[in-house]
Amino acid sequence: MALPSDFRQYGKAAELLFTGDFMEADEGYRLGFLNHLVEETELEPKTMEIARKIAAGPPIAIRLSKLMLYKGLEFDLETALKMAAAAETITLTSYDHGEGTQAIRESRKPLYEGR
């Protein structure tokens, strides 16, 4: 179980980790441990919907966003800001950024190539 970056939730996360207690889904959703709360029959369709949406996005921007999300908290503020600026430069100068902008102008879905 990954700890939330919101310090207010550390107490609940610590309790669950240390006691091994279970949490009901509605409480997990209310506390922000879950992004979505769906019926069991809707779990796979909802998961696939989100996965397709992510897969349709610009690969470079998604890769860099993941890097900043997962590694960003490990760095001091100055380093994190430099990394964010570098990621933005890479993203804004990529082919995919131009393709995304052009697709918006042309009212069509972008065809990202990961470059």
Model features per residue range: what roles?
Residues 16, 68, 87-91:
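Helix-loop "lid/cap" segments that line or gate small-molecule binding pockets
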Residues 1-60, 93-94, 98-102, 108, ...:
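Crotonase-fold acyl-CoA enzyme core
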Residues 69-75:
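Short, charged, surface-exposed hinge/linker loops at domain edges
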Residues 76-81:
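Short beta-strand->loop
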Residues 72, 112-113:
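Short active-site-adjacent structural elements
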